[in-house]
């Protein structure tokens, strides 16, 4: 079975986006190209942060620099509150609470079942980030 190991985002400021993911998720920078592209890794999964200025650069057909291709990124985390604090410090935009105001239960801890056990943040360039301690129905 094929396994996901790489994701590529486009950004108007790849360096700033890379700094966000390094601070918020302790990702390591493995390469920075002269054109500004930055490549990160958590030791298992790789992330390329690209900046396409022309149709030829983008390599995605006719959409070029306006290409939209990623809706959100999901991170499995060990401690949701600690990780949420790191995203707050890195400048993330908290889109959902860590505590369910209706039940007082914690989101992302599996108390709602794996299909909804996540907390969402906004990251650089509008990228949506999911975080969960219990994972998702589709993750092993």
Language-model features: where?
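Vicinal oxygen chelate
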Residues: 75, 85-140
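Amphipathic alpha-helical segments
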Residues: 13-28
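Exposed loop/turn and edge beta-strand positions of beta-sandwich/beta-sheet ligand-binding modules
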Residues: 3, 34, 69, 112-115
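Conserved short beta-strand elements that form part of the metal-binding/catalytic scaffold
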Residues: 28-64, 121-122, 128-133
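N-terminal beta-strand motif that seeds the catalytic metal site of vicinal oxygen chelate
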Residues: 1-15, 70-77, 132-140
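Short secondary-structure junctions
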Residues: 26-32, 93-98
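Short, conserved charged micro-motifs
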Residues: 16, 80-84
